[in-house]
Amino acid sequence: YPESIDWRDKGAVTPVKNQNPCGSCWAFSTVATVEGINKIRTGKLISLSEQELLDCDRRSHGCKGGYQTGSIQYVADNGGVHTEKEYPYEKKQGKCRAKEKKGTKVQITGYKRVPANDEISLIQGIGNQPVSVLHESKGRAFQLYKGGIFNGPCGYKNDHAVTAIGYGKAQLLDKNSWGPNWGEKGYIKIKRASGKSEGTCGVYKSSYFPIKGYR
């Protein structure tokens, strides 16, 4: 795996989006990973619909929170996810309108879990494609992050999904869904060496990525 990578440089990351005021980070994280692998496999970067997951993923709980696995599985089971343009974000859960929407969907075949609490496995995963990761984000330090390599203070009770889109020797590079005015233009650098197997803010505990074949 490469010493460092930033999937933005390879055109595999859409502009930073904003979930607020809805607790739909899970949908944004999943969608960003699907946008990433789709660009890597097809050469096309297409902004996809978080709203479809919010409305239609029955395993998750809308604006009250959801699951990386359930939402990635929804995309695999339902022939893909519609584009952002076709099914735009509304900041609240509505009824599922996926069947009424037209246009092509972006498909995946399934997902894989990165072994928990294993830094190198996660780095290898991110070397191949953007990966959905969880953080503890409720602390003031995380909320007010402005830049640099973040190493807390934070605990390990994961409550927020983001998308790891790169890394360097000292840090992971994560895309958040709190708009471009938060952090470093919407991104956060998380310290890699935390001295704990869970990683800084629990970032190594629960990571998933979608699988998409070449067609």
Curated annotation (Swiss-Prot):
InterPro entries recorded for this chain? Papain-like_cys_pep_sf (IPR038765), Pept_cys_AS (IPR000169), Pept_his_AS (IPR025660), Peptidase_C1A (IPR013128), Peptidase_C1A_C (IPR000668), Peptidase_C1A_papain-like (IPR039417)
Q: Where is the active site?
A: C25, H160, N176
Answer yes or no on keyword Signal. Answer: yes
Top enzyme category: hydrolase
Which cysteines share a disulfide bond? C22-C63, C56-C96, C154-C201
A molecular function annotated in GO for this UniProt entry is: cysteine-type peptidase activity
Q: Does the keyword Cell inner membrane apply?
A: no
Matches recorded under Gene3D superfamilies: Cysteine proteinases (3.90.70.10)
Q: Which UniProt keywords apply?
A: Disulfide bond, Hydrolase, Protease, Signal, Thiol protease
Give the enzyme's EC designation. 3.4.22.-
Which GO biological process entries does UniProt record here? Answer: proteolysis
What family does the entry list?
A: Belongs to the peptidase C1 family.
Q: Summarize the protein's role.
A: Cysteine protease.
Q: What protein name does the entry list?
A: Chymomexicain
Species whose genome carries this gene: Jacaratia mexicana (Wild papaya)
Q: Identify the taxonomic lineage of the organism of origin.
A: Eukaryota, Viridiplantae, Streptophyta, Embryophyta, Tracheophyta
